[in-house]
């Protein structure tokens, strides 16, 4: 946990609308995972390469990102680049994650454990059943809760919008209160 700032809450889609969330979270049992089970969230943009290459080098990353993923709309380019950068370097050990899967009808809530991981060397070890081979940027997570879409808490927490990675407008205290108090 970072001693210099309070934990944040992040939203992460793993694949389109969370379609690959199950592939990264079945190593220790069936999906959805039980509380206190380890798993992963992952994002794409494999064309930028291993983000460890860019640690403390945002300008070099941004330049290479614009080459790998050109877009005439500077706002779109910046938004996409910042999602990858935030996933790799702004998310810290101890931050929280909300990760919905429309396909599975479940929303997972967890806490990040550790730093950014690159899966470029052997992409079959973490999620052998994934169908998108470009999901190579990883973060390890300790799952705290799995909330089904028929639970009232699902609607309250499934507000991460359309971005793959986003900082959510909810405090960690409120998030923990929601998941520990059962259905609201």
What are these regions (language model features)?
Residues 50, 54-139:
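Structured alpha/beta reader/binder surfaces that contact nucleic acids or chromatin modification marks
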Residues 1-51, 123-184:
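Contiguous surface segments at macromolecular interaction interfaces
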């Amino acid at each position: 946990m970072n001693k210099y700032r309070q934990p944040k809450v992040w939203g992460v889609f793993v694949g389109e609308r969370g379609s690959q969330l199950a592939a990264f979270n079945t190593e220790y049992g069936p999906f959805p995972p039980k509380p206190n089970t380890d798993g992963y969230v992952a994002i794409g943009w494999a064309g930028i390469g291993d983000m460890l290459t860019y640690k403390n080098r945002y300008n070099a990353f941004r330049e290479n990102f614009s080459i790998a993923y050109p877009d005439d709309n500077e706002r779109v380019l910046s938004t996409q680049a910042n999602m990858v950068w935030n996933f790799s370097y702004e998310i810290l050990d101890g931050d929280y994650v909300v990760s919905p899967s429309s396909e599975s009808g479940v929303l997972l809530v967890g806490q990040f454990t550790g730093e950014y991981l690159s899966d470029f060397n052997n992409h079959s070890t973490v999620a052998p059943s994934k169908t998108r081979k470009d999901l190579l940027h990883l973060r390890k997570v300790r799952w705290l809760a799995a909330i089904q879409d028929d639970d009232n808490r699902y609607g309250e927490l499934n507000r991460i919008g359309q971005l793959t990675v986003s900082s959510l407008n909810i405090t960690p205290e409120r998030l923990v209160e929601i998941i520990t108090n059962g259905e609201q």
